[in-house]
Amino acid sequence: MAKVLAINAGSSSLKFQLFEMPAETVLTKGVVERIGFDDAIFTIVVNGEKHQEVTAIPDHAAAVKMLLDKLIRYGIIRSFDEIDGIGHRVVHGGEKFSDSVLITEDVIKQIEEVSELAPLHNPANLVGIRAFQEVLPDVPAVAVFDTAFHQTMPEQSFLYSLPYEYYTKFGIRKYGFHGTSHKYVTQRAAELLGRPIEQLRLISCHLGNGASIAAVEGGKSIDTSMGFTPLAGVAMGTRSGNIDPALIPYIMEKTGMTADEVIEVLNKKSGMLGLSGISSDLRDLEKAAAEGNERAELALEVFANRIHKYIGSYAARMCGVDAIIFTAGIGENSEVVRAKVLRGLEFMGVYWDPILNKVRGKEAFISYPHSPVKVLVIPTNEELMIARDVMRLANL
């Protein structure tokens, strides 16, 4: 038995899960929020019970020390030596990483080199890696990249129709995100379908505050909706998704905003928040729409419409589809969005059951047994995917 920590470090947060492998049992999980503040919040779940403490946590290294001390204090481990491996989520691996990798100084250097592609996320992920190196220097650590799964996309999927040298000189191309999630749910779908993944054409819909769709053929990503950044693709909670690029200078001219300010609007004030004027939270929008708010209903329709179009596009791209998967916060829990997305797809063999579609947050088929195209809800488990990669790469 091995104990493996799965870590997701943000700029002021640290999410963690401790697994016993290979049984894949979750021993504990939690989050440290507001790192760098005097009122940081440490939350840990032990035996289903949530424990919380508000205290000063000056930096990520202090958060790591506190986490390990708590694991001992709550009797989850007896000493630091019981941690056999650590897996770190890293948002962007560029073209350098097509798989998870054991962390070395050279790997850290390469992650730093691609950090300009994810300036909000990669530096924070690296801070988490460094913090664990400081406290547990001899424990093998693995970097698991959100972009790696999509490195199997062919050129016709990942290239933009821009001057080719923009790709060769500046690395401008589609990278795609949520790869760890898309990989987990498509592998799980193959298990639930009882068919080898090599034979399947799957469309994975990761729908959370950030949302992306992936076409997965034979277990490999061949296209995905997000692009060079996570701003592209479908409309999201606060992100615009795809727009006409000529709108950026037009908006600058009309509003007097700078390019950076327009990008800020596209990232943080657009999507369902921008359309509804109410909220980026789908639960608020569903409630408002049910009460007759037309703009909330419009935001939901736009969100579903964009996903619906990607499903049709990817079915054409793969010359058919065997199953459609819904995952992440909205995909797992919103029967309203799933119904709007699936509406009208009968022409391609999608027949779904409104009763089965009431499922929330657990694995289920929501298509009729006779439906040629199966529809599944599969809660994502990126942390488990990270732990599995640690086991594989650290030979635990």
Curated annotation (Swiss-Prot):
Homodimer. Keywords: ATP-binding, Cytoplasm, Kinase, Magnesium, Metal-binding, Nucleotide-binding, Transferase. Pathway: Metabolic intermediate biosynthesis; acetyl-CoA biosynthesis; acetyl-CoA from acetate: step 1/2. GO terms for cellular component: cytoplasm. It comes from Geobacillus kaustophilus (strain HTA426). It catalyses: acetate + ATP = acetyl phosphate + ADP. Substrate binds at R89. InterPro entries: Ac/propionate_kinase, Aliphatic_acid_kin_short-chain, Aliphatic_acid_kinase_CS, ATPase_NBD. GO terms for biological process: acetate metabolic process; acetyl-CoA biosynthetic process. The lineage of its organism: Bacteria, Bacillati, Bacillota, Bacilli, Bacillales. The active site is at D146 (proton donor/acceptor). The keyword Phosphoprotein does not apply. Mg(2+). Can also accept Mn(2+). This is Acetate kinase. Mg(2+) binds at N8, E382. GO terms for molecular function: acetate kinase activity; ATP binding; magnesium ion binding. ATP binds at K15, H206, L207, G208, N209, G210, D281, L282, R283, G329, I330, G331, E332, N333. It is found in: Cytoplasm. Belongs to the acetokinase family. The record marks H178, R239 as: Transition state stabilizer. Its cofactor is Mg(2+); Mn(2+). Its main location: cytoplasm. Pfam families: Acetate_kinase.
